[in-house]
Amino acid sequence: MTKQDKDVRAYQQLSTGSFSDPFSFLGPAIDKDQGILRVWVPGAESVYLLVEQERVELEHESYSGFILKQYAPLNEQYYRLAADFSGSEQILDDPYQFHNIYAEYDELHDPKEMYRHMGAQPMTLTRGDECISGVRFLVLAPHASACSLVGDFNQWDDLSLPMQRLDYGIWGLFLPNISAGEKYGFQLKGPRGERLPFKVDPWSFHASLSPHFLSVTFDHSGYQWQDEAWQTREIEPICKQAISIYEVHLGSWMPTQDESISVYRHLADTLAPYVAEMGYTHIEIMPLAEWVDDTGVGQCPVSFFAPTSRYGSPDEFKHFIDCCHQANIGVILAWVAGHFTPHEQGLVEFDGTTLYHHPDPRIGQDQDCHLYFFDYSREHIRRYLVANALFWLEQFHVDGLRVDGVASMLCLDDSRSHEQWQHNIDGGNRNYDASALLKWLNEEVHKCYPRAITIAEDIRMLQGVSEPTFMGGLGFNFHWQVDWVRSSLHFMAALCTEREESLIDMIEPLTSLIGEHSIYPICHDEIAYGRGSLLNQMAGEGKDKLANYRVYFGYVYGLPTKKMHFMGCEFGQNDEWCPSKAMLWQLCNSEAHQGLDILVSDLNKLYRSQAALHELDCDPSGFQWLANEDRYELILAYSRQSSGDDYVLVICNFSMHYYSESQIGVAYEGVYQLLLNTDAACYHGDQGWVSESVESTYMSGEHFDHSVTVSIPPLSCLYYRLI
């Protein structure tokens, strides 16, 4: 093929958006010691070179191509173009003069570095003596035959900016003189040259939802953090910390009517101080990676590196987290790593192949929920997900990640009939590749961010989830105990006269989980999807329902586990949660709901102030049953203790009976002082009589040598501390 034939073919490919090697054809070059400049400007009638003080017209060559021959070499000079479009002249930059857009291997494959190089990265390149600012675009599409950059900067013309195929299946291009706020995306052609749907950037840091879903360039270097005191504070080992988490859906917590202020900024001024005043230690935010469906709650992300723009900008989200930290509140982000949406602009069939999901639908798809599962057997996917986790921790200073749907990641048969799933190599249901990913994820997070907390949402009680990786576990700090919550709520839903048979629901899960690294999650799932509000899951009517609510919370806050509940539970929201509706804050005007609110606040503060209630949550020595055998009295009592001398009794009466002299065995003799009574008048209780302090007496028993005799009102929980 002659050079002329090659030129003709190149122009033909440029004109159809099929050219994969524009650096070999466009831009400045040298031919026989003479400078040549070839540019591609679709729609232009004439093009001029602007360099230093000169203006030189280029010759039209073919299609939309223009060439300048026998000119001084331009290899080291920065130049611009003046193009005439039907009498209107525009000054353009030629991106094909910037060939130095490559990144090193480690920068493109090390999860700690990838998010600093992939996607749209603001940077400055040198051209001759000039430093030119702009944005470099890199996207992985190894099976694509061509890739074009489109955006505001080229009027979404999918022919004007063909990207260069680089190494490792990556396509790249540098656009000079553009900055943050430019909307963009990619137009790709598949392996057979077929035109693919428009794609957003898998690494985009910002997105626009209206009127179309698009990626947006963003510079993460501009925000000035004010949380140094939080980041450098002294802390206990994670398992010994008091952790009380307030789970929040940002869009429905307390919507603002002021459209001039973003949700993120509104919540920085309202949610952060509220959570601090209530005594919580952390906020857990439901998934925030950008999603498309306004009826969803973030469980089906499209842009994994972009906090949803429906609530504000990335910097405004940083401001929200900054304010939380300044209020001494940690922020945990619910993080989706198991699946992605089938939205055609997202990851699905990104380069015309199953680049991100498994080709076998029994492994790669959920036909019922219309989701795609990541193929964890592929190295580029594991790197992408680990890089994403590190990105949220680094760029947004989040204090932890709660990994969504761990059971569905690990179990090939999760929510599937027999014919819908594929066995692993050993004939079992464990997804070994997902296990490898989660181990690596936790190792990288704990190595790079030792203060960060990782939590597994595990509804199947899988073994080893919170064991260290060196012991064969997955390495999470904590895992959810959803079955424990549901069994205890089953007990609380029964009338007091029918609770004898289900008391085991309160005892057995706790007994089997003592010493586990667990969280008791009264999460959004438990008060939605037809289950009803938490308050309405309690037995009884009126005052009895409220009393059941109070004794339940008293029981939960003493358990040897970290705490979490969903927004609205603190004041007894009586409607099932709906993400499109605000919480019923007007309930707080009633004394009954005020009482619940005060109780939860006091429980948070008690839990944090008493080392016995949190220090040994993950150690079997921190918990002991004191009374759990009389199913007719419906009294459960246990002790909590610290590594020092702190010793607290938690005594719960789940019956309608008042016990004036209930004898409870204790491990230590001495005087026990009342810390909290859920039946107190300040919590809108009946203020049944209880002793402010009790002194132990000697008893000859099988388990204890000492006991205390206490009065316990109906449906109440008492906390006593050894003084």
Segments from the language model and where they lie:
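Hydrophobic residues within beta-strands of alpha/beta enzymes
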Residues: 47, 147, 283-285, 401-403, ...
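Short glycine-biased active-site loop of nucleotidyltransferases that positions the nucleotide triphosphate
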Residues: 59, 293-298, 342-349, 466-467, ...
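Short, flexible loop/turn elements at secondary-structure junctions
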Residues: 141-143, 153, 167, 177, ...
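Substrate-binding/active-site clefts of carbohydrate-active enzymes
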Residues: 204-208, 228-240, 249-430, 694
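Carbohydrate-interacting/catalytic domains
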Residues: 1-241, 264-279, 543-546, 557-565, ...
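Conserved alpha/beta catalytic core and glycan-binding cleft of carbohydrate-active enzymes
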Residues: 397-399, 414-582, 587, 608-664, ...
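Non-transmembrane alpha-helical segments in soluble domains
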Residues: 272, 321, 389-393, 442, ...
